[in-house]
């Protein structure tokens, strides 16, 4: 059986996390040549490349499996040995989460874990349709995702759904939708997306108004909180989590432009198996809080 040296695995992990050999060498306090040599040793052991030498480098499928193994072993080892504060500081917990969860329910869910556990949280923000891929690549040990099916050697639980409403300010509605939201009026109404892969707004318009992708003018803004601000100041209409704008809707500073047309996104919690005690606490906290604030029907 091929048993990797965890020192070489840590070099592979550093190259991926630091997005290059030079910064990985600085992180590990060794030379860049030593980093390359350790990865070469690992590749020789497994008889195949473990890195794709792009900019930034990315792991091959075998590299992803090895990184997942490393992260799982690190969690289990630290807890089994009781090293709450190792020489590298508190344990690093890397999770992939979507921006809307981060802006609404996720941090309150993690509050008891952060209060009781000495750890460093590394939240990697990604669209919920792509967070699972970060888990597959071994970049994180847990992910909030749209995908209901677990990856091999992983566990999954349903968290609940975020309901999205098509919102804008009253002034925006009066300007762009004086006669209500129609197919023709939507063509002139500025929208906003998180990035060029964010298709929620387009999917909503296509499903309910038969507008093809790319039909409406759309800003790109990488911030869930900025979506709300843009809507409040009358700049755009956009899909917003009901959980995020309940107060604004009650006050009337935002309005639901299409009552009854709800875009529901069910969220799932993925993580490696077996779970460490820390990950079990994270799982319990997310599921418990999700039951309180996310839609369960």
UniProtKB/Swiss-Prot annotation:
Keyword RNA-binding annotated: no
InterPro entries: ArgP (IPR017685), ArgP_gammaproteobact (IPR023490), LTTR (IPR050176), LysR_subst-bd (IPR005119), Tscrpt_reg_HTH_LysR (IPR000847), WH-like_DNA-bd_sf (IPR036388), WH_DNA-bd_sf (IPR036390)
Keywords associated with the record: DNA-binding, Transcription, Transcription regulation
CDD domains, A to Z: PBP2_IciA_ArgP (cd08428)
Gene designation: argP
Source organism: Edwardsiella ictaluri (strain 93-146)
NCBIfam families found in the cross-reference section: argP, PRK03635.1, PRK13348.1
Function: Controls the transcription of genes involved in arginine and lysine metabolism.
Signal sequence coordinates: none
One Pfam family in the UniProt entry: LysR_substrate
Name used for this protein in its record: HTH-type transcriptional regulator ArgP
Gene Ontology MF terms in the entry: DNA binding; DNA-binding transcription factor activity
DNA-binding region: 21-40
Subunit: Homodimer.
Record-annotated HTH lysR-type domain positions: 4-60
Family: Belongs to the LysR transcriptional regulatory family.
């Amino acid at each position: 059986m091929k048993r990797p040296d965890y020192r070489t695995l840590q070099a592979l992990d550093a190259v991926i996390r630091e997005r290059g050999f030079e910064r990985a060498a600085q992180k590990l306090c060794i030379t860049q040549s030593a980093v390359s040599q350790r990865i070469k040793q690992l590749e020789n052991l497994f008889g195949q490349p473990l890195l794709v030498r792009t900019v930034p480098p990315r792991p091959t499928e075998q590299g992803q499996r090895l990184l997942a193994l490393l992260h799982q072993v690190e969690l289990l080892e630290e807890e089994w040995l009781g090293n709450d504060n190792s020489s590298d500081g508190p344990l690093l917990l890397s999770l992939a989460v979507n921006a809307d969860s981060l802006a609404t329910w996720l941090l309150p869910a993690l509050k008891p874990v952060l209060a009781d556990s000495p750890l460093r949280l590394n939240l990697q923000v990604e669209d919920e349709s792509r967070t699972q891929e970060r888990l597959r690549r071994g970049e994180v040990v847990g992910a909030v995702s749209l995908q209901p099916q677990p990856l091999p050697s992983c566990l999954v639980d349903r968290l609940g759904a975020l309901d999205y409403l098509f919102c804008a300010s009253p002034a925006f509605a009066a300007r762009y939708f004086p006669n209500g939201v129609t197919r023709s009026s939507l063509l002139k109404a500025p929208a906003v997306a998180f990035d060029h892969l964010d298709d929620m707004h387009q999917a909503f318009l296509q499903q309910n108004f038969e507008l093809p992708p790319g039909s409406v003018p759309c800003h790109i803004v990488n911030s869930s909180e900025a979506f709300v601000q843009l809507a409040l100041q009358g700049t755009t209409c956009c899909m917003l989590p009901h959980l995020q704008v309940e107060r604004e809707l009650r006050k009337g500073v935002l309005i639901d432009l299409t009552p009854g047309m709800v875009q529901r996104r069910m969220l799932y919690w993925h993580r490696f198996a077996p779970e460490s005690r820390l990950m079990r606490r994270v799982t319990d906290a997310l599921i418990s809080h999700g039951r309180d604030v996310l839609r369960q029907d």
